[in-house]
């Protein structure tokens, strides 16, 4: 009886270990082998020598830029597969720069280059536009930066084109608007301005600089004399631009309100006469005004860009500009286009007047190509005087008054009658 009891309770060695389970088994074998670990913390008798430790460090060179990238390229010339190597002496494989010189080249200070693809940008124009755009993307302490830059001046002086050149040089793709879009259904032009402004703000939100560019604002929102109808849309356009200039980060679309602020978007507008605009819009706090009147150097620089592909010498361009000092810059572009008239006239004579439509609009050969005509200073002077005579005719002959008073052509053909020749002959 006792033996039976002891075999059940005492669990002798003959009992299978599977019966005890895994956890019990581990505890059973390790229960009498517990050890205590004693951790001793001893203070260092002397301070560590940092210099000795650094000298012994195999990675100490990481803290100092002592390598020469160009020489590294040279050393690896015979080791790296030639498939992955550019020819020596080409590009960055010219072994002349050290690593520090590479950094200084990458962080070098760029000069104020005022050309874009060979086209001239007036330094004063470029300075005004770049500073205005940069200020509007900065946080200046206790400074109220005008949101709108108004560029105005005479007709044909290249205001819009100079703006496009500066935008291209800065890598900006602006949201474009025209004054022709500022007249439609009631309230639509003001809504359109807000939509375009929000589109530019979305582009800025995506990490790319942008601005709103409105061409010829005075033609759409201005008042040109007593005969011009001043509509509600004109009022709303002026009021909208004033509101945006006052709160550039809170521009809402009609019918909705978004509490989230939008980025500040600088606005560039061009025009010929800003005195026709609503006076509170053009006050200094809202609009910074810039009168663009190109100097002789600016006109020469732009004209060199106009004739840059025609091999016209610089002294001929200077003479051309000095011969027509009162003309706009656009005059010289029209003058260059006039030189191609002879080539077109010759082509029409070869193909025949009745075949022009078939040849130009729906032809397998495509439009004709011309060899670049030779532009001499004599030919340019001749066409320039022709353009001036046509301008004088428009100013001298007031055909509208003639039509009202008599059925006559006025003095439009007097010059041709006296000389016996018409223009373009």
Swiss-Prot record:
Q: Name the species this protein comes from.
A: Hordeum vulgare
Instruction: List the GO terms this entry assigns under cellular component, sorted alphabetically.
Output: chloroplast stroma; thylakoid
Q: Does the keyword ATP-binding apply?
A: yes
As for what it does, the entry says: Activation of RuBisCO (ribulose-1,5-bisphosphate carboxylase/oxygenase; EC 4.1.1.39) involves the ATP-dependent carboxylation of the epsilon-amino group of lysine leading to a carbamate structure.
Please name the taxonomic classification of the source.
Eukaryota, Viridiplantae, Streptophyta, Embryophyta, Tracheophyta
Could you identify this protein by its name? Ribulose bisphosphate carboxylase/oxygenase activase B, chloroplastic
Which protein family is named in the record?
Belongs to the RuBisCO activase family.
- Subcellular localization: Plastid, Chloroplast stroma
Instruction: Supply one GO molecular-function term.
Output: ATP hydrolysis activity
FT transit peptide: 1-43
InterPro entries (UniProt xref): ATPase_AAA_core, P-loop_NTPase, RCA-like, RuBisCO_activase_AAA_helical
- Keyword 4Fe-4S listed? The answer is no
The record, for SUPFAM superfamilies, names: P-loop containing nucleoside triphosphate hydrolases
A Pfam family reported for this protein in Swiss-Prot or TrEMBL: RuBisCO_activase_AAA_helical
